[in-house]
Amino acid sequence: MSYLKFDKTLMTNLEEALPREILRTNRSGAYHCTTIVDCNTRKYHGLLVIPVPELDDENHVLLSSLDETVIQHGAEFNLGLHNQGDNYSPRGHKYIREFECEKVPTTIYRVGGVILKKEKLFVHHENRILIRYTLLDAHSATTLRLRPFLAFRSVREYTHENAQ
């Protein structure tokens, strides 16, 4: 039995879910830090944050997040969640059914007849994160589209949208 397991009720309530953060590290100095609903709310949050000693003495966010979109019958369901001021979009947390954080952080999503499992694991001595998706159930042909948000910025800096 897992003591770090959260169900749909908590995961769909942002007031309860956003203050709960997860931090995973490896032996090379890299880390993954975000909220349990995968919404980066702090400037040091990121899916892959690593030290870059050739550049400076700071950690750098290389991969901010990885947005998943489930596509079925031409309909798209974005599983991502981003914070833009007081607005949260695209609100993919509503598809989370369960989150467990034992040895491997695991999130279960349900979108209609699709049940998708996501697991995140660090490689011990490398600046690398592995993400495995398992399609547990689907009643029809299903496509999973992945969209990485690359940052390559210091954890001390924010990046802003270009004005163009």
Predicted features and spans:
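Terminal accessory carbohydrate-recognition/targeting modules of carbohydrate-active enzymes
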Residues: 1-164
